[in-house]
From Swiss-Prot:
Protein name: Small ribosomal subunit protein bS16
Top-level lineage group: Bacteria
Family classification: Belongs to the bacterial ribosomal protein bS16 family.
Key words of the record: Ribonucleoprotein, Ribosomal protein
GO biological process: translation
Recorded name of the encoding gene: rpsP
InterPro entries: Ribosomal_bS16, Ribosomal_bS16_dom_sf
Protein source organism: Leptospira borgpetersenii serovar Hardjo-bovis (strain JB197)
Length: 88
């Protein structure tokens, strides 16, 4: 099963994360299929960038987001957009 999850990058006390589509059995920082966004929590204002079209495509194809990624999608409004697309 494909999961949308965070992959840690950055240095020791300055974490940066990629939001990736990866096989659920792969290690956290292992192989991934596609990069769908970035998340930088350590900055003064949390910075997130998303590729909405890619995310919606992966979700429609059955990818499952992890809890943390789901919270990021909800705060950005992507999850609500996905739910309305499902109802149509």
């Amino acid at each position: 099963m494909v999961k949308l999850r965070l992959q840690r990058t950055g240095t020791k006390h300055d974490p940066h994360y990629r939001i990736v589509a990866a096989d659920g059995r792969a290690p956290r920082d292992g192989k991934f299929v596609d990069i769908v966004g970035h998340y930088h929590p350590a900055q003064i204002k949390e910075q997130t960038t998303f590729h909405k079209e890619k995310i919606l495509t992966w979700l429609k194809n059955g990818a499952r987001p992890t809890e943390t990624v789901l919270n990021l999608f909800k705060s950005a409004g992507i999850w609500a957009e996905y739910k309305t697309a499902l109802k149509k």
